[in-house]
UniProtKB/Swiss-Prot annotation:
It holds the Pfam family Phage_sheath_1C. One of its GO terms (biological process) is symbiont genome ejection through host cell envelope, contractile tail mechanism. It comes from the Viruses. One of its GO terms (cellular component) is host cell cytoplasm. This is Tail sheath protein. Its main location: virion. Polymerizes as an extended structure around the baseplate-tail tube complex. During ejection, the sheath shifts to a contracted form, thereby making the inner tail tube protrude through the host cell envelope. It comes from Salmonella phage ViI.
Length: 631
């Protein structure tokens, strides 16, 4: 309550109270997952938006080693476009660094801020992985701009003290282009020797005899240039011609030739202009002075701009200088353990999520995933059997899936099991792959939350259809589904005319309870979060009748909304002197009882058909009379 200060003189005093606090049923639908990728922040959750396109932008396209992780997450993102994604690498992973230097490991921005590499490392790949070896950094100053190969990509020429910087894909893997092209020079030898002599080619003095022909001298030149492995990547001799390819990327000075006056001579021309590759990122009018600004007021200090915004490099340089820096030494390590990355997600305030899922190669990773949701109590973890349980295991799928469930040794309403793997197309590598269905099942739940509400079942024919699968590893029969369902395992069933459908909505809770269905668990997750969000505004207030009344009046409309939406049959809030005794008040607590009667989803439909004689009334059969026949 806000008041004016006391006044002795006549005045009007005012007070202000806020009795408008309220809440509405709402839930943020985004997933959380971990996996191995070719690129991206490591051990630091990244919010991917924009579906699969956003996943590629943050973590790059998959290769054979990362495809399963990638496709499981892409599967989820086809239903719900947002997810927290945490990349995992093995202990041997390295970032690429300035050519000729020893590679280091920088997992994320926090690592970079504490890194202190040797002074010889001026640039590094942003993240661990061999993909960083494809990168070069090309810096241009005012003197070199008129002939710079990338000059047409910039609107303004740099002035004295300014630099243009481009990050270049020299291989073509990043930009799906041809990559860098080495300059090719053709050296043509001609003339007739009048005496023994010497010709200088690329700084190498090559002697010839008075009997040597142009073809003979060309062979000698080829042998000399072949030894220059740091200069030329290829040397080919054809008759009196030597064709060389420069090792350095980008345009180069044509091979220098200095003939003598003994009759044999040579000329060099450029037949293929070198190219450094395709631009990934560019930075215009950078400066070396900290605090420098562009004319529009934007930051121009190169270290701040590049290190804060680049998705591909970090710079440790003290100053920019014209030239090309190639990166090397990046190493992939896909020998990972996902458990540590899963535990990073155990921060509900920082990483709001509902479905949690991941491709898991080991049982301990699935257990960690389940434990995460059980501890957070605001998410549901989705798991599928390990691959060999269902893929290529014809006839033993049911038994092995049940054994897998038993080996999980987990009993909680905060996880959800399906029984299948799916066969999907990997468009990035042009091949079919098996992936666990957990990403799709999590996506089906996320889609159901968005279109029907978290308090509705995501399963069966109305909301339980999958989008992306070519076929499933197996489809349990009715009898097999009954066995699986008794073990809290939800089947994914293939119907010839309706497609692939999730056929169950049980959580992993073994005891008979309302919480053994995911719609009830979802309802309580939402209600607990929504009401807790408003309850925090009562911290610091006095535990008196007025405060308790305010709280109750804020929650009652919420309960009515739940009932009107079909989430509950009925509900009640109690926050008064009965449950806020003197002891509770003295302990600086406020206690509220919130009781909800949840709706239940239909899992079985029983249809009772009866043949009725013409002289009978329907009311007679409604009482249950008649003979139950087997045929």
């Amino acid at each position: 309550m806000a008041t004016q200060s006391f006044s002795v003189a006549p005045s009007v005093q005012w007070t202000e109270r806020d009795a408008t606090l309220q809440t509405s049923p709402s839930v943020v639908v985004q997933g959380a997952t971990v996996g191995k990728f070719q690129w991206g922040e490591v051990e630091l959750p990244v919010l991917v938006t924009g579906g699969e396109t956003g996943l590629v932008k943050k973590f790059f396209k998959p290769n054979d080693s990362t495809a399963t992780d990638f496709l499981v997450i892409a599967d989820f993102l086809s239903y719900s476009s947002m997810a927290w994604v945490t990349r995992v690498v093995g202990p041997l992973a390295k970032n690429s660094v300035t050519k000729g230097q020893t590679a280091i490991t920088i997992k994320n921005k926090l690592d970079f801020e504490t890194a202190s590499p040797s002074a010889s490392i001026t640039w590094a790949g942003r993240y661990p992985g061999s993909l960083g070896n494809d990168i070069a950094i090309n810096v241009c100053d005012s003197a070199g701009f008129p002939t710079w190969e990338f000059r047409n990509n910039f609107a303004y020429a740099p002035q004295s003290g300014e630099f243009h910087v481009v990050v270049v894909d020299k291989v073509g893997r990043i930009t799906d282009s041809a990559g860098a092209v080495g300059q090719v020079d053709r050296i043509s030898v001609s003339g007739t020797a009048t005496a023994a002599g010497t010709i200088s080619v690329a700084g190498e003095d090559i002697a010839y005899l008075d009997t040597d022909t142009p073809a003979t001298l060309a062979t000698k030149i080829g042998a000399a240039l072949t030894a220059l492995t740091d200069v030329y990547s290829s040397v080919v001799v054809k008759s009196n011609t030597v064709i060389v390819t420069h090792k350095a990327i980008g345009p180069q000075t044509v091979t220098a030739i200095v003939p003598d006056d003994k009759g044999l001579t040579a000329t060099a021309v450029i037949t293929t202009v070198g190219a450094s590759g395709s631009i990934i990122e560019k930075y215009e009018l950078m400066q070396n002075t900290q605090g420098s600004k562009k004319s529009d007021g934007a930051n121009a200090y190169f270290k701040d701009v590049i290190n804060d915004t680049s998705n591909w490099v970090y710079t440790f340089a003290t100053a920019l200088a014209a030239g090309v820096v190639e990166l090397e030494g990046g190493v992939d390590d896909y020998n990972i353990n996902r458990v540590a990355a899963i535990q990073v997600l155990n921060n509900a305030e920082a990483y709001d999520a509902k479905p949690v899922f991941a491709y898991c190669e080991e049982l301990i990773e699935q257990q960690a995933l389940i434990d995460l949701s059980t501890e957070r109590k605001d998410t549901v973890s989705f798991v599928s059997p390990l691959r060999d349980t269902v893929v290529g295991n014809r006839g033993r799928e049911m038994d092995d899936v049940v054994s897998w469930r038993e080996s999980l040794v987990r009993d909680s309403s905060y996880f959800f099991m399906d029984d299948n793997w799916a066969y999907v197309y990997d468009k990035y590598n042009d091949k079919m792959r098996w992936i666990p269905a957990c990403g799709g099942t999590a996506g089906v739940w996320a889609r159901s939350i968005e279109i029907a509400g978290i308090y509705k079942s995501p399963a069966f024919h109305n909301r339980g259809k999958y989008n992306n699968y070519n076929r499933m590893a197996w489809s349990a029969s009715s009898d097999e589904r009954a066995v699986l369902y008794r073990n809290q395992i939800n089947s994914i069933v293939t119907f010839s005319n309706e497609g692939i459908v999730l056929y169950g909505d049980k959580t992993g809770l073994t005891r008979p309870s309302a919480f053994d269905r995911i719609n009830v668990r979802g309802l309580f997750i939402m209600a607990e979060q929504n009401i807790a969000a408003i309850a925090k505004y009562y911290l610091g207030e006095n535990n008196d009748a007025f405060t308790r009344s305010l709280f109750s009046n804020a929650v009652r409309p919420y309960i009515r909304q739940l009932a009107n939406m079909g989430a509950i049959y009925d509900g009640k809030v109690k926050c008064d002197e009965d449950n806020n005794t003197a002891d509770v008040i003295a302990a600086n607590q406020m206690v509220a009882g919130i009781w909800l009667k949840p709706e239940y989803s239909i899992n079985w439909v029983y249809l009772d058909f009866a043949a009725v004689r013409p002289d009978m009334e329907f009311s007679e059969i409604e009482s249950g009379g008649g003979i139950v026949a087997a045929s």
